[in-house]
Structures are given as structure tokens and as C-alpha cells.
Swiss-Prot record:
InterPro entries: Ribosomal_uL15 (IPR030878), Ribosomal_uL15/eL18 (IPR021131), Ribosomal_uL15/eL18_sf (IPR036227), Ribosomal_uL15_bac-type (IPR005749), Ribosomal_uL15_CS (IPR001196)
Alphabetical keyword list: Ribonucleoprotein, Ribosomal protein, RNA-binding, rRNA-binding
Disulfide bridges in this chain: none
Species: Corynebacterium urealyticum (strain ATCC 43042 / DSM 7109)
Name of the protein in question: Large ribosomal subunit protein uL15
Organism lineage string: Bacteria, Bacillati, Actinomycetota, Actinomycetes, Mycobacteriales
Single GO molecular function: rRNA binding
Domain of life where this protein originates: Bacteria
Length: 148
């Protein structure tokens, strides 16, 4: 009976692993030019990945960025008067919390009411901002507008 095979005894077969040719280490191992040919940029060192062969580089072809980004810009969530009529058909007082409960807006973000559509129910709406047409339509329907 032979001994069981052990992991630390395993070796690759003879000739299975061939050593990598180390170029440029004497004439026998591609000495002198080391497989790079003679002279020129590629023989002497590497060309950067971004080099386009003398063509105007991409970063210089593209226009410069102009202007700036206003980090203090307030982005409002939008609700139209037609949405208000659908969500509150019986009329009454409508605050931002009611709009959140109705699923029209998310909490913790300012709300602007816009005048798209028609409204016929009396609503007393409280929000951060209103467009001119939204104010006009809500007040024409007998409601009121309060900016919070």
C-alpha cells in the first residue's frame, strides 16, 4: 500500500511550468533592444495612455466649464391645483402635512402650488410658495392661500 497523498507533497509535473523570459539580460535573452526594436519613443520609454499621437487631446478639445452651481438653490416639490381637487374633494383646510399624508409630496422638502388644471372646491391651502395663477384659482373657488 502506498502512502496517502498530502497537500504539501503536491508538485507540478516536470516541464509544466516554464520560466518567464527576462528580457534585456544578456544576448541570449533578447539582450540589447529587448524586443522593442531600435530607437524611437517606444524603445526608450512608455507613451502615456492619454497621448493621441499629436492630435489635439480630448481635454483640450472640450469647452471649459462656465458659470457655477448654486449650492443654496431651493428645489420645490410641485403640486397642481387639479391634484388638490382630486385629493381633497370635500374641501377644507390643507397643510403640507395633509399633502404628505395624501401622498402628493414628501416630508421635509418645501412645496410650491402651481395653477395647472381647474379647481371648484373651497380649500384653505398652506404651503411655502404659490404661483400667481394658483393663488387666483384657489381664491376664485372661494378658498384662501397662506404662505408658510
Amino acid at each position: 500500500m502506498s502512502d496517502p497523498i498530502k497537500l504539501h507533497d503536491l508538485r507540478p509535473a516536470k516541464g509544466a511550468n516554464k520560466a518567464k523570459t527576462r528580457v534585456g539580460r544578456g544576448e541570449a535573452s533578447k539582450g540589447k533592444t529587448a524586443g522593442r526594436g531600435t530607437k524611437g519613443t517606444k524603445a526608450r520609454n512608455k507613451v502615456p495612455a492619454y497621448f493621441e499621437g499629436g492630435q489635439m487631446p480630448l481635454q483640450m478639445r472640450l469647452p471649459k466649464l462656465k458659470g457655477f452651481k448654486n449650492n443654496n438653490k431651493v428645489i420645490f416639490q410641485v403640486v397642481n391645483v387639479s391634484d388638490l381637487e382630486k385629493a381633497f374633494p370635500n374641501g377644507g383646510d390643507v397643510a403640507v402635512a395633509d399633502l404628505v399624508a395624501a401622498g402628493l409630496v414628501r416630508a421635509k422638502q418645501p412645496v410650491k402650488v402651481l395653477g395647472n388644471g381647474e379647481i371648484s372646491v373651497k380649500l384653505n391651502v398652506t404651503a411655502q410658495k404659490f404661483s400667481g395663477s394658483a393663488k387666483e384659482k384657489i381664491e376664485k373657488a372661494g378658498g384662501s392661500v397662506t404662505e408658510a
